[in-house]
């Protein structure tokens, strides 16, 4: 997803307006942190000297935490046992803030706990206490009634299935039916092989392994993943599949045939605990505020890249996501400024996809409305617009020794920030003729009162089947005039 400032801040802050209903398997995540200095004399195992212990809501509880961290309003429904872990979970959720938790207490049920022992940022052991028994019918009915009531003022429903028995077949199907009746999209983080439980869901978010298990198909390549996802959608009336692929990123496949592959954005991976929770929560908040699935997946991919760089069952806050998106935008701006060889490769790729390539050029020293209008009108004539930019030496030869005011890298960065510009190439010559011959644009655009025979490169473009367009410029704006007024 491409987001331009200042839209980034309003987009991220907009996640705080999402109203989400969440149901699923809650569990207590305990982390025992320490260090290892020796091997036990009793057995060939490390001895962990404990320094710190932490406990926090996990499973669907971590989805709730992530939603709250993004600023969303969350109604969370689940079931716990009448045990110490259940009481600890209720207290932990109350401390979180922003989560309206409705936990059904089921006598005799074991609350799931996962205890991870960690030394030097590495897990050395995990110990589980859990039940996978389906919730009894009476408790499931109470939970479904509470969820149906909660949907009245929610924008999206999330079902977080960890296979611990809360999402019984009857509950899952009833929840999806209630949401569809209310016109609310349903996102499912699935578990197991039987996706008939999720029939009618808007989006399911399996990881690559889960997708393979659910379909019995190979899922090693992009093509195999797309084929498996399409089979899943067709079999169970699912609207879209978002496949999380660890270091390979994410794939988004929709029932209307659209496919998007997103590269992973993590720089360092310390712990993947709960990364899927971050993905589903970001998707939910984004869809709840009206973003498209492709846009929501882009945000979720960025959020996942943040959370795997943390230790433990972690969350992503609004300010972290905002910083990540701004960092990515700067990287994208840099990527839009290319040398000649890179530009040739990029243009060849566009042309292979059947895209029309346009070209215009100039000094663009102090960007003004005339420049902006020229670029917008040029971009309207093509699918991709390349801007040839005179280098500092070239500008000095053309405009005089006091020009340019801004160096070429600064001018290129400003141009790259415009949505109308797809690529900027700096050239050293006085004219862009060599650049035009190298890139062979389909459309050559010039602003002003030129005639075609006076436009550099026009004959070459026309000889190769292209066309030349002259667009009107906005009168009253020029860099030279602006500088003259400043000198007064």
Curated annotation (Swiss-Prot):
GO terms for molecular function: ATP binding; heptose 7-phosphate kinase activity; heptose-1-phosphate adenylyltransferase activity; phosphotransferase activity, alcohol group as acceptor. It comes from Parvibaculum lavamentivorans (strain DS-1 / DSM 13023 / NCIMB 13966). Pathway: Nucleotide-sugar biosynthesis; ADP-L-glycero-beta-D-manno-heptose biosynthesis; ADP-L-glycero-beta-D-manno-heptose from D-glycero-beta-D-manno-heptose 7-phosphate: step 1/4; Nucleotide-sugar biosynthesis; ADP-L-glycero-beta-D-manno-heptose biosynthesis; ADP-L-glycero-beta-D-manno-heptose from D-glycero-beta-D-manno-heptose 7-phosphate: step 3/4. NCBIfam families: cyt_tran_rel, rfaE_dom_I, rfaE_dom_II. Homodimer. Coiled coil: none annotated. Keywords: ATP-binding, Carbohydrate metabolism, Kinase, Multifunctional enzyme, Nucleotide-binding, Nucleotidyltransferase, Transferase. GO terms for cellular component: cytosol. This is Bifunctional protein HldE. The lineage of its organism: Bacteria, Pseudomonadati, Pseudomonadota, Alphaproteobacteria, Hyphomicrobiales. It comes from the Bacteria. Residues 359-488 are annotated as: Cytidylyltransferase. PANTHER family: BIFUNCTIONAL PROTEIN HLDE (PTHR46969:SF1). In the N-terminal section; belongs to the carbohydrate kinase PfkB family. Its EC number is 2.7.1.167, 2.7.7.70. It catalyses: D-glycero-beta-D-manno-heptose 7-phosphate + ATP = D-glycero-beta-D-manno-heptose 1,7-bisphosphate + ADP + H(+); D-glycero-beta-D-manno-heptose 1-phosphate + ATP + H(+) = ADP-D-glycero-beta-D-manno-heptose + diphosphate. Pfam families: CTP_transf_like (PF01467), PfkB (PF00294). Gene3D superfamilies: 3.40.1190.20, HUPs. The active site is at 277. GO terms for biological process: ADP-L-glycero-beta-D-manno-heptose biosynthetic process. Residues 1-332 are annotated as: Ribokinase. Catalyzes the ADP transfer from ATP to D-glycero-beta-D-manno-heptose 1-phosphate, yielding ADP-D-glycero-beta-D-manno-heptose.
């Amino acid at each position: 997803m491409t987001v331009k400032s200042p839209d980034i801040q309003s987009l991220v802050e907009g996640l705080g307006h999402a109203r989400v209903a969440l149901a699923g398997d809650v569990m207590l995540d305990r982390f025992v942190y320490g260090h290892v200095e020796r091997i036990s004399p009793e057995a060939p195992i490390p001895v962990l000297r404990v320094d710190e212990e932490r406990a926090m809501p996990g499973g669907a509880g971590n989805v709730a935490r992530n939603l709250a961290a993004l600023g969303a309003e969350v109604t969370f429904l689940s079931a716990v046992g009448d045990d110490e872990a259940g009481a600890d979970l209720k207290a932990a959720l109350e401390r979180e803030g922003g989560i309206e938790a409705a936990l059904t207490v089921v006598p005799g049920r074991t609350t799931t706990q996962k205890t991870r022992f960690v030394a030097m940022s590495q897990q050395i052991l995990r110990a589980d206490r859990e039940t996978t028994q389906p919730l009894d019918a009476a408790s499931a009915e109470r939970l479904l009634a509470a969820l149906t009531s909660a949907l009245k003022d929610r924008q999206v429903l999330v079902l977080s299935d960890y296979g611990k028995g809360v999402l019984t077949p009857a509950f899952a199907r009833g929840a999806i039916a209630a949401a569809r009746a209310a016109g609310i999209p349903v996102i499912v983080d699935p578990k197991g092989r039987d996706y008939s439980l999720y029939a009618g869901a808007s989006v399911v978010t399996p990881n690559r392994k889960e997708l393979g298990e659910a379909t019995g198909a190979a899922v090693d390549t992009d093509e195999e993943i797309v084929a498996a996802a399409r089979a899943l959608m067709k079999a169970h009336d699912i609207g879209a599949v978002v496949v999380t692929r660890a270091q390979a990123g994410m794939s988004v496949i929709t029932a209307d045939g659209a496919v998007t592959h997103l590269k992973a954005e993590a720089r360092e991976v310390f712990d993947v605990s709960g990364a899927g929770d971050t993905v589903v929560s970001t998707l939910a908040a984004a869809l709840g505020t009206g973003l498209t699935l492709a846009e929501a997946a882009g945000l979720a991919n960025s959020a996942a890249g943040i959370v795997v760089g943390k230790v433990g069952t972690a969350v992503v806050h609004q300010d972290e996501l905002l910083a990540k998106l701004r960092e990515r935008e700067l990287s994208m701006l840099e990527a839009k400024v290319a040398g000649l060889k890179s530009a040739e490769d990029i243009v060849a790729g566009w042309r292979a996809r059947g895209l029309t390539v346009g070209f215009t050029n100039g000094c663009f020293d102090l960007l003004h409305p005339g420049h902006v209008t020229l670029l917008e009108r040029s971009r309207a004539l093509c699918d991709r617009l390349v801007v040839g930019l005179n280098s500092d030496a070239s500008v000095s030869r053309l405009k005089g020794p006091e020009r340019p005011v801004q160096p070429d890298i600064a001018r290129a960065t400003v141009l790259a920030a415009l949505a109308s510009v797809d690529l900027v190439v700096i050239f050293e010559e006085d004219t862009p003729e060599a650049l035009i011959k190298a890139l062979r644009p389909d459309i050559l655009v010039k602003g002003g009162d030129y005639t075609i025979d006076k436009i550099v490169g026009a004959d070459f473009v026309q000889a190769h089947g292209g066309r030349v367009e002259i667009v009107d410029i906005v009168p009253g704006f020029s860099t030279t005039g602006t500088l003259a007024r400043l000198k007064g």
